[in-house]
């Protein structure tokens, strides 16, 4: 995320909408500094990509990964599932606080669905079913 923000800082000089689509894993002090510098002269929007299984983890065995390492977890124990949900809620609060300090709204999308469709829905953009319909919409704008 920090590398992406460094690049955004070079590109977004003034009055630009910077959209961060991320799981926000690994937000640190450097992330906060970079984002604050960007948001000083630009608008920001955060789109959190989340895993619905973290909201309500199922009982049973589950393989989890941080992108590099994998771990098999036995989620039959209710206390472990509750702890995972608590950790997820605390993580959500940190992300919300991070974006609130930047005056950046937060939207959420799931890693289970089509990202483009979810973003269009969140932004209130109706899906276009075919090319003819899209062309007729563009004619209306002229």
Residue ranges of predicted features:
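Acidic beta-strand-to-loop metal/phosphate-binding motif
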Residues: 17-23
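Von Willebrand factor type A / integrin I
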Residues: 10-14, 28-142
């Amino acid at each position: 995320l920090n590398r992406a923000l460094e690049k955004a800082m070079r590109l977004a000089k003034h009055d630009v909408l910077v959209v961060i689509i991320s799981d926000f894993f690994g937000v640190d002090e450097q992330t906060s500094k970079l984002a604050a510098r960007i948001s000083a002269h630009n608008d920001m929007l955060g789109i959190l990509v989340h895993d619905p299984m973290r909201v309500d983890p199922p009982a049973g065995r589950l393989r989890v990964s941080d992108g590099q390492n994998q771990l098999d977890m036995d989620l039959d124990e209710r206390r472990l599932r509750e702890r995972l949900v608590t950790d997820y809620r605390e993580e959500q609060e940190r992300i919300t606080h991070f974006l609130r300090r930047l005056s950046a709204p937060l939207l959420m999308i799931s890693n289970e669905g089509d990202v483009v469709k979810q973003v269009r829905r969140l932004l209130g953009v109706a899906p276009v079913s075919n090319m003819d319909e899209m062309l007729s919409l563009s004619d209306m704008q002229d």
